[in-house]
UniProtKB/Swiss-Prot annotation:
Portion annotated as DNA-binding: 16-35
SMART domains in UniProt: HTH_XRE
Organism expressing this protein natively: Methanocaldococcus jannaschii (strain ATCC 43067 / DSM 2661 / JAL-1 / JCM 10045 / NBRC 100440) (Methanococcus jannaschii)
TM annotation in the entry: none
Domain HTH cro/C1-type: 5-59
Biological classification of the source: Archaea, Methanobacteriati, Methanobacteriota, Methanomada group, Methanococci
Highest taxon in the source lineage: Archaea
Keyword rRNA-binding: no
InterPro entries listed in its UniProt record: Cro/C1-type_HTH (IPR001387), Lambda_DNA-bd_dom_sf (IPR010982)
GO molecular-function term, one example from the UniProt record: DNA binding
Protein's name in the database: Uncharacterized HTH-type transcriptional regulator MJ0272
Record-linked SUPFAM superfamilies: lambda repressor-like DNA-binding domains (SSF47413)
Pfam families membership: HTH_3
Keywords: DNA-binding, Transcription, Transcription regulation
Amino acid sequence: MKNKLKYYRALHNLTQEDLAKKLGVSRQTIIAIEKGKYDPSLKLAFKIAKFFGVKIEDIFIYEDDE
């Protein structure tokens, strides 16, 4: 799944470490999400969207693999 997490993080002048602490996850989790190597749980995806004050689909873009 593609995402705009890095864009929103930069928009708010947050480091990966800052965002990880605010969301209660590891920096490695943020890195993996930004690189598209890890899809967050639905709970975490909603938490991220709420943190930035946007809709979940503004950050995460679903791509049909078929």
